[in-house]
Amino acid sequence: MIVDIYRSAKKEGMYLYVPRNKALDELPEPLMKQFGRADHSMVLVLTPEKKLARASVEKVIESIENQGFYLQMPPPPESYMNEIPNDKMPR
């Protein structure tokens, strides 16, 4: 499966995978409103053997086949506050 990957101009770390032959205006309006301006990032060939950095390729392919897209959300922010010792809190 050949996909176009778009980077969200609205939210860093958010990416949208769509089949190569699908136009962005065919995607649901609420999705595109949440995603914001889509900046083309790359074209990728997805195969079951392919490794992706933050998603299972099987999950991505399944989502594209069922919904027509895969939305990769940004990773959760690291909670540096958990690392700060607090002598008033039991451990």
Swiss-Prot record:
Residues in YcgL domain copies: 1-85
Residues annotated as transmembrane: none
Annotated Pfam families: YcgL (PF05166)
Domain of life the protein comes from: Bacteria
SUPFAM superfamilies: YcgL-like
Segments for region (Disordered): 72-91
Protein name, as recorded: YcgL domain-containing protein Sde_1339
Organism: Saccharophagus degradans (strain 2-40 / ATCC 43961 / DSM 17024)
